[in-house]
């Protein structure tokens, strides 16, 4: 192959999506020049692990899935760390690195520059002791701050996944945790009320849960001392802002890339953007929902990795389509696990479906076998076609049920298909009527 055939691929962002894209291009086209520019010193890191480092279950260095050397030496990727892309134009990018600025040419460009924490516009967010949980160094900074200032009182602002995981991280260490949630319940965008009610029951045993309160300001002299809401004030030596994230679309806008209705970069099923030879993947990109076909922005790691893989494949000439997402997600607080896949009842009604639902309580083992725990499942079905639209699970041993339900949704199962799915059974693992099968039966067909 002649020198003129070697393409230059530039990838902005060295997280899950960026490194997946880079690795895929190099595997298919080893002779191509693949450059990744990562603004921090962390590549292929696992931000989802931050709460567990704060809890003391792991260490920050373990949050890097592969060290940079693996990508540079083993995979031949030209990886630039602490390299911030400051300008993007047709055919080149300008990068700030090593104290200077440099331009690099591209034939193909991938935006994989993720999302950033949404910091509320309130007084005191810049005080010492106020943190976001965004990158592995945040975990280290939080641990060090806790030890240095002997933190006992923690306030978490936000009731989403990160808020709940951070609440566990501090409560498990015996800290006094207050959680301030603007909405009427936690995880309200992801789950229906019956499901979050069970989680909240557990939360309230370990956390001062303040629902429907708006944070007005954070106060302190040298460092944070208290959080003031429209309903009261709470002592705090440490505050976590878990108030959501937003896609980093500024660089894409410079190039005139179309921003989708969700506020993230619009992509097609090949992860191509509206600009030729420009792709986007991961938390910066929107995709389609498998059930509704609508545009959605679901910034979660498994999809981000796959989007990167798909972008890399298509750049290297091996056509591959990304089918979209179900928004499958799972988290836990202490021993209560909660997960979902597909649409909630709330979402399905909003989409115009005529739905039937069922909410059941079951056990994870037969009654005669020790170790059985409670599990609750909610199913949402299209009333006309009996097609499964979504499943939510809360309690214990939820993962096999959520993952099985996700596969069912991907395959377009009806309640009857779900009911007749031949699941495994033995007393140490599950009851003879698995909770998921019982749910299908109660949903009727």
Swiss-Prot record:
Key word Cytoplasm present: no
Domain description: When compared to homologous enzymes known to reduce CoA disulfide, this enzyme shows a narrower access channel for CoA substrates, which suggests that this restriction might be responsible for the enzyme's poor activity toward the bulky CoA disulfide substrate. The substrate channel was widened by making four mutations along the channel wall (Y65A, Y66A, P67G, and H367G), leading to a fourfold increase in kcat for the NAD(P)H-dependent reduction of CoA disulfide and enhanced activity toward the substrate at lower temperatures.
Organism: Pyrococcus horikoshii (strain ATCC 700860 / DSM 12428 / JCM 9974 / NBRC 100139 / OT-3)
Required co-factors: FAD
Activity's thermal dependence: Optimum temperature is 85 degrees Celsius. Thermostable.
Binding sites annotated in the UniProt record for FAD: 16-17, 38-39, 45-47, 85, 283, 301, 425
Quaternary assembly: Homodimer. Homotetramer.
One GO MF term: protein disulfide isomerase activity
Binding site for CoA: 27, 44-48, 65-66, 75, 305, 361, 433, 441
Assigned keywords, A-Z: FAD, Flavoprotein, NAD, NADP, Oxidoreductase, Redox-active center
Official protein name in the record: NAD(P)H coenzyme A polysulfide/persulfide reductase
Function: Catalyzes the NAD(P)H-dependent reduction of polysulfide, CoA-polysulfides, and CoA persulfide, as well as the reduction of a range of other small persulfides, including TNB and glutathione persulfides. The likely in vivo substrates are di-, poly-, and persulfide derivatives of coenzyme A, although polysulfide itself is also efficiently reduced. Shows coenzyme A disulfide reductase (CoADR) activity with both NADH and NADPH, with a preference for NADPH. May also play a role in the reduction of elemental sulfur.
SUPFAM superfamilies: FAD/NAD(P)-binding domain, FAD/NAD-linked reductases, dimerisation (C-terminal) domain
Family designation: Belongs to the class-III pyridine nucleotide-disulfide oxidoreductase family.
EC number(s) recorded for this UniProt protein: 1.8.1.-, 1.8.1.14
Catalytic reaction(s) noted: NADP(+) + 2 CoA = CoA-disulfide + NADPH + H(+); NAD(+) + 2 CoA = CoA-disulfide + NADH + H(+)
